Amino acid sequence: MLTRRAVLSCAPLAIAGSVKAGPRASVESISVISRQPEFYHGWPTLAQDQQGGLLVAYSGGREAHICPFGRVEIIRSSDGGRNWSWPQVILDSPIDDRDAGICITPAGSLLVTTFTSLAYRTVFAHANDWPAERLARWRSADERTSPKQRAYLLDTWMLRSTDGGMTWSSPFRVPLNSPHGPVVLSDGRLLYAGKQLWTSTKKVGVCDSRDDGKTWNWLGSIPVRPSDNVAEYHELHAVETLHGRIVVHIRNHNALNPGETLQSESDDGGKSWTVPHPIGVWGLPSQLLRLRDGRLLMSYGYRRAPFGNQARVSSDGGKTWSEPLLISSDGAGGDLGYPSTVQLADGKLITVWYESMKDMPHAVLRKAQWSIVG
């Protein structure tokens, strides 16, 4: 659990022949959109509502990458990303609330996903040299819950709003988790690709919902490569191609293709899946988007020099991917990424990610506006 987001060691590209030359990114602007520099912000997801408004869900209120203070927040923009609201806290459990995904259903409901973690307790157990005030702060946060209460709170969660996010349901348990949450399929179903986190099996696969996100049912498991440990598959995301194939990307930490994105496909609506295979892309995790012209876009963090965020385009439904398009390359280190992209009505792209910047005390949310040339 603690190594899931460790800065990754260098690894050579695999299956280089599957990567072909293609378009480039024309980046118009990059800006910081979070407004509370006293807090660490992490692992956002960007969504666009039916009126064109933008919403970002993320883990906010934090002290560090791992801490007991994480909560789920949302910020909004009604002008294409130029200005952003003050954060709305929608979940603040007594333990760490982490990566936040967001999906807007065909009915207009908002679904936000997250998971809780006790990883901060391992950090705290080795914090003997901390200042007394920080030790007391973490201890008091931890003592809000008993061991039994912590065990109850440790799970994968979803919240639902049917009034545009003014009010939210209580969090309810879902069978799996991934950073960027569910997607909408052409048949109206909601599909959630992810991983079981706090179970003994660590199964990866997809669930679907046919009732606007109220309930979720396990649909299909993704097989494991013969040499792989399923526990080293992480942070899945899905997209549906124009022809109905579903493509899923997987963050891989196995010895074969370490630090690369693996891909699996389904041609029967998510019931069965191909064995994951490398696509020649180092960097993760990947968020997938189908562009209006039918091409697929993958956005992913790049945690080695040049530190930043990249994207690639597929013109053939995920069979091959272009060379990288640089969204940002000015990062100070590896604590960045989880980019999430939407396409505006004018065809331009907005990508949001988190990043620890050298001139900021804590990680912030950054936004790029850009276009694909070619």
Identify the residue ranges that each predicted region occupies.
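Asp-box/BNR beta-propeller blade signature and adjacent active/binding-site loops
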Residues: 22-374
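N-terminal secretory signal peptides and thylakoid transit peptides that target proteins
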Residues: 1-12
